[in-house]
């Protein structure tokens, strides 16, 4: 593997289930098989991860898909062009509300998205303060919350102000009544519910399309200078993805997630059983049938930015920006 342009690689991640393939590739030695020595760096927030990737402290990162078109548009005030060769997860987030708020609004666990939207919007119109948090402005979670509110009132959805919280801080934030609800990926909805703080009232796949949520992101300049290194990284992570899809026993994977403090609650086939199997299903179906980035996903993200922020762009510009988000060298398959 001496032909690799770089052997020491810094990979940033946020503690969520959908960084699992990166962690598993390291644990199983798949990076080492490719001649790579990887340093896994846990970041405090999406903003810090974005900045450290843009300024070269990280070579590669577990990244929000919407960060890429946002950077291309200059919305994040970055001078870096971000690209992805690989999807890490597709749309699989949830909206949770405080349990006492659910009781006050008569929201039951089996409620549908339209009903939960109607009851929250009605509370907002009655000036019953309902503060909602997203993980970052440029994320499917942000768009999911807006589209959820828009099921009832598009104007309110467009003008609604959201708070921002890193995924690992969601449980603490709702427990301390910093906000009343949030949209985030797992395992943070499950943890907040198990600890008695919130209930899940909506699922993102029932609100927005099955677009890429997290991707493996690099700066375009770094990718152009390190094509063989990037190919090796993708090969290792794809091997981990394939392994996770096929494994019948995820006990080692579970232990790894506990070690990384991603799973911080007791959950097994004997305790919180439905949550246990839900997490296993998410791990096995993280990226759907294909982990290849799709032009239509980034086109949808750009359309959302245009819809909610009135960003002007022609159809040709939208296509060009969407294409620029995808690393063009074909990823190696396992």
Each model region followed by its residue ranges:
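C-terminal non-catalytic accessory extensions
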Residues: 328-334
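Loop-centered beta-sheet repeat module
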Residues: 165-219
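Short, glycine-/small- and polar/acidic-enriched structural segments
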Residues: 3-155, 180-187, 197-203, 209-210
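Secondary-structure end/capping motifs
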Residues: 227-321
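Inter-helical turn/loop segments and adjacent helix faces that build the functional surface
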Residues: 155-160, 224-229
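Short glycine- and hydrophobic/aromatic-rich loop-to-beta-strand nucleating segment
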Residues: 95-96, 215-218, 222-223
